[in-house]
Amino acid sequence: MAYFNQHQSMISKRYLTFFSKSKKKKPFSAGQLIGLILGPLLFLLTLLFFHPQDLPWKGVYVLAITLWIATWWITEAIPIAATSLLPIVLLPLGHILTPEQVSSEYGNDIIFLFLGGFILAIAMERWNLHTRVALTIINLIGASTSKILLGFMVATGFLSMFVSNTAAVMIMIPIGLAIIKEAHDLQEANTNQTSIQKFEKSLVLAIGYAGTIGGLGTLIGTPPLIILKGQYMQHFGHEISFAKWMIVGIPTVIVLLGITWLYLRYVAFRHDLKYLPGGQTLIKQKLDELGKMKYEEKVVQTIFVLASLLWITREFLLKKWEVTSSVADGTIAIFISILLFVIPAKNTEKHRRIIDWEVAKELPWGVLILFGGGLALAKGISESGLAKWLGEQLKSLNGVSPILIVIVITIFVLFLTEVTSNTATATMILPILATLSVAVGVHPLLLMAPAAMAANCAYMLPVGTPPNAIIFGSGKISIKQMASVGFWVNLISAIIIILVVYYVMPIVLGIDINQPLPLK
């Protein structure tokens, strides 16, 4: 266990070092400084010189705001969350929305769904339930190198459906490295060193990639999906329920994990090592060190199961009582969170309850503010007439094959999110695709869903996602290796996403992909 803790500390330091190296000591990097100036400049130039006859002044004003915010999001001229506060200032100044209307978007039900999800995830982490779940899954799947690789992917993917992708990978990487270290120490004379090294690289990448893939399983698994839910409601007044998305998302995760496992094991890092020296023994040892499940773990496990059941059965049960509109997914998330604050802890002097308000320090408030900013901007785009105008301009695409548009959108977003924030990418592109769907005469989810899913999937560069940065920080994989392997995983993801959106999602959600919805 000491080695595990030591390695976890080492990963954390390398993870932080990776990002600290990428930041300049100056207040702004060259790119940030350019973005800082370019954003307001585009705002002014748009107001002064862009005046189409069929676009009202309010539409021009919101377009100018959008260009400013998008520039600062992409270049990260100031923190992304700080940029997301601009609508509170700029939309009322242009008489687009009242201060009350803008501010209310930052308290949208969708934001509270994610807030509740974060609190539940932190409860799992505080009482170490996620580690027990992960080790149990790995132990059950088997002892061969192929099964250990699959076990780590299944465990990481499952965790990242409910806790952040970053937290899932941060937990699993030290365990993986400890197993590799044990294998090196117990290596037999006839064991091929190259095979162990190949397994080592495949395991590190498998953990990182599974953390990213698993986020697609639930609406709270990754920010782009919660943005999809919010933007879809904002533009069209329809809801994507937690349960229905799971029916779409979990099969997608299973297929992606399976194909990625096959690719890493038998193509990218093919080796002849069938069994890893000491691998299964170490997993059992770590499970034994956890001991019996504590009272607090049982409470969190029960709450987790309760939350899942309520999310899954909400629509079915509440329709019978005719109160569907009174209880949303966010309502359930906050109810579950309150239970965690109420139930006392027993086996510790440090924490009196399962969760206390100290947890607020760990919540990613910046992500929640970004969601609110995106929803406020979407409201401004709709209210100003900009959405209608954009739809008219995009009518030239009417007649282009919908499948071709889906392919282009998916691949474009997949590679764009390698160098930009996945959350900012989804926030910027989904309102445009909402309007585009009306222009080309297709259901909005045919365009918006693949973009949101693709925004989550970045496998090539350390800066693409926090999981990528963590596995790069392990020192076991080079950027060149990550890019070459990640390129093919990107393409695999694109193919699966397109097939799921075109053939599975319409059946599950009960939509006609050729039937557009009117904008609100």
Swiss-Prot record:
CDD domains: SLC13_permease. It is a multi-pass membrane protein. It holds the Pfam family Na_sulph_symp. Keywords: Cell membrane, Ion transport, Membrane, Sodium, Sodium transport, Symport, Transmembrane, Transmembrane helix, Transport. It is found in: Cell membrane. NCBIfam families: dass. Mediates the transport of the dicarboxylates fumarate, malate, and succinate across the cytoplasmic membrane via a Na(+)-electrochemical gradient. Belongs to the SLC13A/DASS transporter (TC 2.A.47) family. NADC subfamily. The chain crosses the membrane at residues 30-50, 55-75, 77-97, 104-124, 160-180, 207-227, 242-262, 298-318, 323-343, 362-382, 399-419, 428-448, 452-472, 491-511. This is Sodium-dependent dicarboxylate transporter SdcS. InterPro entries: SLC13A/DASS (IPR001898). It comes from Staphylococcus aureus (strain MSSA476). GO terms for molecular function: organic anion transmembrane transporter activity; symporter activity. One of its GO terms (cellular component) is plasma membrane. GO terms for biological process: carboxylic acid transmembrane transport; sodium ion transport.
